[in-house]
Design a protein with these regions (language model features):
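Post-signal peptide N-terminal regions of Sec-secreted extracellular proteins
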Residues: 27-176
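Secretory targeting and sorting signals
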Residues: 1-27
Length: 176
């Protein structure tokens, strides 16, 4: 190989290594998340055993061009005095994932979706009665304006307390 060709190959290699990689058209969006935890009282129980559920929700959002994506992951550590796999702990449980337009004041919801599959998972337990678990929602998406965020709300309807769904708000994701 001639000296000129070697120099050209070396120059191309140096430029290729120094140049930043072009973003891929199919690159996955980078999610920004916020996590918060609440101790939630089982209002249908007033006996002697501890009945609070520690529930943590991580809410995540990402942007790709004009589209915002959001999902939530919920983790729980529930009261273990109930019978194994007791289907009467709650009458309903759902996690609502929202995409909001970030503005001064109240952020308006541009899209939301409820994921009701949580009730059966909360009532499931190990053979020793431990009620711990994790559930990640599917991702929702929506074309949103310049600044948006993901938010989530847990709705619990304890069996037999007569109060219906009680709302538990969690920390929204950082803006994207």
């Amino acid at each position: 190989m001639s000296t000129l060709k070697r120099a050209a190959v070396a120059a191309v290699a140096v430029v290729a290594m120094a140049a930043p990689a072009a973003p891929s058209a199919t690159a996955a969006p980078v999610y920004k998340c916020a996590t918060s935890t609440k101790d939630i009282d089982d209002t249908s129980y007033d006996g002697p055993w501890p009945d609070n559920w520690k529930v943590t929700v991580k809410t995540c959002a990402a942007r790709s061009a004009d589209t915002v994506y959001a999902y939530a992951e919920v983790r729980w550590d529930g009261a273990s005095f109930h019978p194994v796999d007791d289907p009467t702990i709650s009458d309903g449980a759902k996690l609502r994932v929202q995409i909001k337009q970030s503005r001064e004041g109240t952020d308006p919801v541009v899209v939301e979706r409820d994921f009701p599959g949580l009730e059966e998972r909360l009532e499931d337990s190990t053979s020793s009665g431990a009620r711990t678990g994790t559930y990640r929602t599917p991702t929702i998406s929506h074309r949103a304006g310049a600044v948006a965020l993901g938010d989530s709300v847990l709705f619990l309807d304890w069996h037999g307390d007569g109060r219906g769904y009680q709302r538990h708000d969690y920390t929204a994701s950082p803006t994207v």
